[in-house]
Amino acid sequence: VFYIVNEPFADVKDAGRRTLKAFKVKNRFVHFEFFRLTKDQRLGKKGDIVALEVNMRPSGGFSPDMMNYANSTNVFKIWADVMAFGHSDLKCGEKYFCAFAGRRDGKNFIYSEKDITERYAGSIKTVARVPDVLSGAMGNVMYIANFRTKAEMDGFYKDVLATK
């Protein structure tokens, strides 16, 4: 599982902006991966934001689509506008938590795909087979859905992943 938050934390935004500045990034579609320390370590204190990856390219897999769903926008149009015109006027719309859950073949799930798609009909954005090349990391069947609250998203994860 992974998800796009409905609003990034201020310290994560700050870390991203400082990373852009440090790498002198202009007019690029980039993605950075940060994590928050859950205890004091050599890298920093509990709660600190630490960079895991700095990528000068869009994120892979289905995450650009999830960014679109989470922000009611089109990140590819924004990128094209920036490349063509130096800026984009496209605004984000309503914000959501966008959840990805992957199921593995051969597991005995409590709820069928039909059960999940009916229960979460208003939230589901995509249900599809994951390409074999990605299935080792992401599962064989993916569910992508939007939620207004983290609690709703957590309930979705619980239902999608529950086994007998």
What are these regions (language model features)?
Residues 4-7, 71:
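Alpha-helix N-cap and loop-to-helix initiation/capping positions
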